[in-house]
Amino acid sequence: MAVVLDLLNNDTRPKVEAPARPRHPEKAHRPDTAIQRKPDWIRVKAPGSKLWAETKDIVRANNLVTVCEEAGCPNIGECWEKRHATFMIMGDTCTRACAFCNVRTGLPESLDAAEPEKVADAVAKLGLHHVVVTSVDRDDLKDGGAEHFSRTIAAIRRASPGTTVEILTPDFLRKPGALEVVVAAKPDVFNHNLETVPGKYVTVRPGARYFHSVRLLQRVKELDPTIFTKSGIMVGLGEERNEVVQLMDDLRSAEVDFLTIGQYLQPTRKHHEVVRFVPPDEFKAYETTAYAKGFLLVSATPLTRSSHHAGEDFARLKAARLAKLGPAPVAVNA
């Protein structure tokens, strides 16, 4: 063994770099699908302003991950120009393999114990009045990352007491007690996306369970009715209108306050194809239907994303609840 190591150490042959690990190894076997040309109503301005660069520098300096970059969000230029960024905690590698998502998949690294403080520091430096924190799925962790969420919320509260906190969580499937840990940290908004209608889960979101996600949102309200709840879906995946309307009913039965609906955009040829681009007038019709069903707030446009305009939407949420329901209810320990 020593001889082999000596030979390797003295080897002067040119080093051959190992091939980069594919971003989505589980999708390698999938046939390529054509990426359709986007219609005019989905075009966005390319990022590159001074404020955008400043936001990027703060994110890099704190060695943070943002879902804006990892998911290829089309609104990154607009949001970062306003110094808004959605922080993605617990690494850049997800343990799920959803057919729509551009986030890297595989076996994640260990948690960074300093990450909550790094996020809090970036929030303070950016001067955020409202921050959105999301994460990859961490099925490898006993609590799914619930304690890490809790610590991040607490760190932000310490560093920026006036900042409201919105979280976008995974489903904590088969992680008993995890949700209770996160809710106890008292985020101002608890967001968990259904992503699509139940009939599409097998092909679009195979690692999740639709009614588990609905129940998760319902349980948040049972644990603390003062927390706003929010969920979002993508359209253009082949769903029917009646399926979307039924999904609205399911969310209202769980007392969800805020619904977002946006156009699905295909990240690569290996991802789920865009079945169609839904025109703006159909988004408007979805918005009208959702408001009629009792949602406090609805955002339904082709470029709507969960965190887009989150700060402004939080102010609108508070105003809508006050106008419709009166002062916020008092939390009851469950």
From Swiss-Prot:
Its cofactor is [4Fe-4S] cluster. Residues 8-33 are annotated as: Disordered. Keywords: 4Fe-4S, Cytoplasm, Iron, Iron-sulfur, Metal-binding, S-adenosyl-L-methionine, Transferase. The keyword 4Fe-4S applies. [4Fe-4S] cluster 1 binds at C68, C73, C79, S307. Its EC number is 2.8.1.8. GO terms for molecular function: 4 iron, 4 sulfur cluster binding; lipoate synthase activity; metal ion binding. Pfam families: LIAS_N, Radical_SAM. It catalyses: [[Fe-S] cluster scaffold protein carrying a second [4Fe-4S](2+) cluster] + N(6)-octanoyl-L-lysyl-[protein] + 2 oxidized [2Fe-2S]-[ferredoxin] + 2 S-adenosyl-L-methionine + 4 H(+) = [[Fe-S] cluster scaffold protein] + N(6)-[(R)-dihydrolipoyl]-L-lysyl-[protein] + 4 Fe(3+) + 2 hydrogen sulfide + 2 5'-deoxyadenosine + 2 L-methionine + 2 reduced [2Fe-2S]-[ferredoxin]. PROSITE patterns: RADICAL_SAM. It comes from the Bacteria. Residues 80-296 form the Radical SAM core domain. [4Fe-4S] cluster 2 binds at C94, C98, C101. The keyword Membrane does not apply. Pathway: Protein modification; protein lipoylation via endogenous pathway; protein N(6)-(lipoyl)lysine from octanoyl-[acyl-carrier-protein]: step 2/2. It is an enzyme of class 2 (transferase). Binds 2 [4Fe-4S] clusters per subunit. One cluster is coordinated with 3 cysteines and an exchangeable S-adenosyl-L-methionine. InterPro entries: Aldolase_TIM, Elp3/MiaA/NifB-like_rSAM, LIAS_N, Lipoyl_synth, rSAM. It is found in: Cytoplasm. This is Lipoyl synthase. It comes from Methylorubrum populi (strain ATCC BAA-705 / NCIMB 13946 / BJ001) (Methylobacterium populi). The lineage of its organism: Bacteria, Pseudomonadati, Pseudomonadota, Alphaproteobacteria, Hyphomicrobiales.
